[in-house]
Amino acid sequence: MSWIPFKIGQPKKQIVPKTVERDFEREYGKLQQLEEQTRRLQKDMKKSTDADLAMSKSAVKISLDLLSNPLCEQDQDLLNMVTALDTAMKRMDAFNQEKVNQIQKTVIEPLKKFGSVFPSLNMAVKRREQALQDYRRLQAKVEKYEEKEKTGPVLAKLHQAREELRPVREDFEAKNRQLLEEMPRFYGSRLDYFQPSFESLIRAQVVYYSEMHKIFGDLSHQLDQPGHSDEQRERENEAKLSELRALSIVADD
């Protein structure tokens, strides 16, 4: 049998109804989950936009590297092809930057501002917990004197303890009432707050990918050679690769 120590300074009287405590824990638990979800979403959105920018910047660098390749100086068709690619990559990068800026302004920043509210909320909960501990301590003190023989000194101390208890009880009840009223309102406000951000995110993605469809459609028309299917190009590449492999400098020993 395990030993359970007495709780020093704990009142016998149930000063906070269990239903009230359950309601408080439920509402605060929902806000703790919302805080974590907000933090994670902000982090993931930042990682996503950083990856988008890195992708388009890399694509531009690749096209510039191809333009500086000596092969482009020797073949006008190849130069035209790579120039078209470079133009497309720069257009893509420009639209990508616009998209990222829009997401930063209308999604990431609102997420950051929303998340900045939680430290104040958590501090209010801590103040409520401290008020509850003070309430329990003084209630236990009152109960201790109530159980003693009612002598003059004891009655004086009991009166003093009750006077000390009254403002502490009122302070806790006010803090508890305020949190129970405002936590559900705060949680319910998340939909109205975030809906414009998510609509902006969707619009930014739609605009970006619509522009990408145009850019790569134009690029495809510039690069297409009449009468050449993907299968034909693949066969031609394989034939050229076979010719290269036949050279003595790359032949297997």
From Swiss-Prot:
Q: Where is this region: Disordered?
A: 220-240
Question: Which residue range or ranges hold the BAR domain?
Answer: 9-232
A Pfam family in this protein?
BAR
- Give the Gene Ontology MF terms in alphabetical order: cytoskeletal anchor activity
Coiled-coil parts of chain:
18-51, 120-152, 231-247
Q: Which UniProt keywords apply?
A: Cell cycle, Cell division, Coiled coil, Cytoplasm, Cytoskeleton, Septation
**Annotated compartments:** Cytoplasm, Cytoskeleton
- Keyword Metal-binding listed: no
Instruction: List GO BP terms, alphabetically.
Output: actin cortical patch localization; actin filament organization; cytoskeleton-dependent cytokinesis; endocytosis; myoblast migration involved in skeletal muscle regeneration; plasma membrane tubulation; protein localization; regulation of lamellipodium assembly
What does UniProt note about where in the body, tissue by tissue, this protein is expressed?
Answer: Ubiquitously expressed except in brain.
Which superkingdom is the protein from?
Answer: Eukaryota
List, as start-end ranges, the regions of compositional bias called Basic and acidic residues.
227-240
Name where it mostly resides.
Answer: cytoplasm
The record's GO CC annotations read: actin cytoskeleton; cytoplasm
- What does this chain do? Involved in cytokinesis and septation where it has a role in the localization of F-actin.
Name this protein carries in UniProt: Bridging integrator 3
UniProt organism field: Homo sapiens
